[in-house]
Every structure is written in C-alpha cells, then in structure tokens.
Amino acid sequence: MKSTPSLYQWVVIAPKNDNTFLQAEQMLKDKKCVGIKIHPYCHKYSIEEYGDKIFSFAQKHRAIVQIHPGKEVDSIVRFANAYPNATYIMAHLGGENYINAIKNAKYGNVYSDTSGMASMKNMIVEYAVSQIGSERILFGTDTYSAASQRGRIEFAIISQQDKENIFLHNAKKLFKL
C-alpha cells in the first residue's frame, strides 16, 4: 500500500472464521484501510445470523462497513439502529428497499453507493436524491467500472451540488480524507 499512496483498501470479514476478526483488528489500525467489507452471499452466511458479531466489532472500532445486503436489506436498519457508532454502506444502490433502509435508520448512519448495474436503472439516482437527499449517496465505492458510473452521475438530472456531494464531499467527510 505504501507504493500506491492514492489507493485505499477494505478488510474483508468472513465471520465463520474467528481469525478474520484478528486480521481486521490489525488492518483497521492502518490509515489506508477505510473499513470493513462483508459479502454474505459469497461467504455463505446470513446477516441475521452473524450481524451482532460483525456489527458489534465494527461499533467497537467505529468502523465503516460496506455490505452486499442481497435480500437482507431490512436487516441493515435493525443493526444500524442497534450499533449506531458503526457506519453502513449498502453497495449497489438498489431501489426502494435501499432508500427505505436509509430513511429508517434512526442515526443517519446508513448510506448507499452508485456502483454496479442496479444504479443504472432509469432515473434511480434522481429518485434516490429526491427521497433521501444526496448526502448519503457515495460514488462507486465498490465498482470496477468507474467510467460508466461517472457518466450516470454527470448526466443525472440533479443539481451540481448533489453531484459534488456524490462524487466528492460525502466520501471526504465519511472517510476523513
């Protein structure tokens, strides 16, 4: 990481392996590690089953957790409200259930990002901004295709300030850059 100063990383937690938390503890001490990434589908576990273990750890470290919630979007709200000192980014702005999760988080600690195909749906970015504002939407924190995502925001029918929030200001604030 020292040879690439502009590159930041996530530490992946696979909660079925207790050693994952030891590794995460060490990696979170590095300023280049921006938070924790979980992917329940790929690691074959349920957020409901392992959420307390993961999010209590995240709260203890005041960590940002990037989540691929799949069908468990509603679970995120419960955990975000139970562990308010952690911050939650649901990858791939997905639609109404994501927007409702962000609205229903009591502490304003749930965000989404614009990565992936879901945010390419017609007018989803505009709809999300109209429902929750631009302050809890991040530009592609989990994308492999920044160019297509960038165009999606640049040409969205939202204010210049909303675009700047999504592209820059929200990440700077959240990741303390």
What do these predicted ranges mean?
Residues 1-64:
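Active-site gating/metal-coordination segments in enzymes
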Residues 119, 142-146:
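Small/polar glycine-rich anion-binding or flexible loop at a beta-alpha turn
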Residues 134-136, 146-177:
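Mid-to-C-terminal alpha-helical segments outside catalytic/metal-binding sites
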